[in-house]
């Protein structure tokens, strides 16, 4: 196991591992600990009481953060005709049909979000092995397979993030950058927490959110008190 840097070790001394912090206090602490030489991403991680072997307990969706993500998203849209024009007018960075599919098959992946109209999915489906592992495959559950391409583009540009349980029931979601004011990070954090709570599968029994932490790119995790929401 790699040895942690002195900066990380110094940051870890600021965290009481036996304490669950108020959400605002936790975010402040992460900002204080951050030592990256760039504007690091702040991320929240949920440990959920779900059995991901059960299809109805696999969470997946998307939410628009009220204060954005701090990242300019490059958005592509697979569409034709009026829908292609609609996507362009909404500010999509690249719009195309077979040509765009071919471009990706040739190795181009310089984008953050892919959106498609339903009638394009027969062609886009050929990209599953390329886009799927990178989390870029258009999907109705995340609002990226839709006829309302203008809304999808606008949401993505405004700060939409996706979430999905991994096989151990964890969900990791970015909430912004260390440079954000604490209240903006907390606002995004609360929006995600509310979204996850509302997505609770009906079949889950007992405590749904078992643990919740916030961290940045290089800092230790800080446990958050769920009662502070």
UniProtKB/Swiss-Prot annotation:
Superkingdom to which the source organism belongs: Bacteria
Signal sequence range: none
One record GO biological process: translation
Record's keyword annotation contains RNA-binding: yes
GO MF: rRNA binding; structural constituent of ribosome; tRNA binding
Gene Ontology terms: cellular component: large ribosomal subunit
A family per Pfam: Ribosomal_L1
Keywords: Repressor, Ribonucleoprotein, Ribosomal protein, RNA-binding, rRNA-binding, Translation regulation, tRNA-binding
Family to which the UniProt record says this protein belongs: Belongs to the universal ribosomal protein uL1 family.
Chain's role: Binds directly to 23S rRNA. The L1 stalk is quite mobile in the ribosome, and is involved in E site tRNA release. Protein L1 is also a translational repressor protein, it controls the translation of the L11 operon by binding to its mRNA.
Assembly: Part of the 50S ribosomal subunit.
Protein name: Large ribosomal subunit protein uL1
Gene name, Swiss-Prot/TrEMBL: rplA
């Amino acid at each position: 196991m790699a040895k942690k840097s002195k900066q990380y070790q110094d940051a870890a001394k600021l965290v009481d591992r036996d304490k669950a912090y108020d959400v605002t206090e936790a975010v402040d602490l992460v900002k204080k600990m951050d030592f990256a030489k760039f504007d690091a991403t702040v991320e929240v991680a949920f440990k959920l009481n779900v059995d991901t072997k059960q299809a109805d307990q696999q969470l997946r969706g998307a939410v628009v953060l009220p204060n954005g993500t701090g990242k300019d998203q490059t958005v592509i849209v697979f569409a034709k005709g009026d829908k292609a024009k609609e996507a362009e007018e909404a500010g999509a960075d690249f719009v195309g049909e077979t040509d765009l599919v071919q471009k990706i098959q040739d190795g181009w992946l310089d984008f953050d979000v892919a959106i498609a109209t339903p009638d394009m999915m027969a062609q886009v489906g050929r990209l599953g092995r390329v886009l799927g592992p990178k989390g870029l495959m258009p999907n109705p559950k995340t609002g990226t397979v839709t006829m309302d391409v203008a809304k999808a583009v606008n949401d993505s540009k405004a700060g939409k993030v996706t979430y999905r349980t991994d096989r151990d029931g964890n969900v990791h979601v970015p909430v912004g950058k260390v440079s954000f004011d604490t209240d903006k990070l907390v606002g995004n954090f609360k929006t995600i927490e509310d979204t996850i709570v509302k997505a609770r599968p009906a079949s889950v029994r007992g405590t749904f959110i078992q643990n919740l932490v916030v961290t940045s790119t290089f800092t230790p995790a800080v446990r958050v008190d769920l009662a502070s929401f």
